[in-house]
Amino acid sequence: NEETIAVFGLVNSTVFQDFPKLKIIVSHGGGAIPYQLGRFEAPSLRRGTGKRFSDGLRQLYYDTVLYTEDALRLLIKTVGADRCLFGTECPGTGSSVDPVTGRSMDNVKPMLENIETVSAADKQKIFCDNAKAVFNLK
């Protein structure tokens, strides 16, 4: 998907060296990047530049528009809570309801609130503090 391609291209470019103050927020939790991290990390190590793909991921920010708790947990584990910003697609495709469970697909807020392995401080970062920092808000 397009998020995966964009993240791969940005991390493997010099854009953050050329524009060190640039802040980019990637939609949909970075696409397949967290799930396929090992496949992207291996070539970066093979190049022998000393630059790990996973370190480059932490130069970007990611929204939490992911529809499963497992995907959300993996994103936070992969890039860190300080690189995640709360996001939603409601109304829109996120308004879809799973006919089996009755759950709205884009119920990120309660889903994140109920992940016990994410601390209250990290939840505060994701819901509020990170956006304030990215957009220089008080």
Segments (PLM) and residue ranges:
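H/E-rich (His + Asp/Glu) clusters that bind or coordinate divalent metals
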Residues: 1-14, 18-19, 23-138
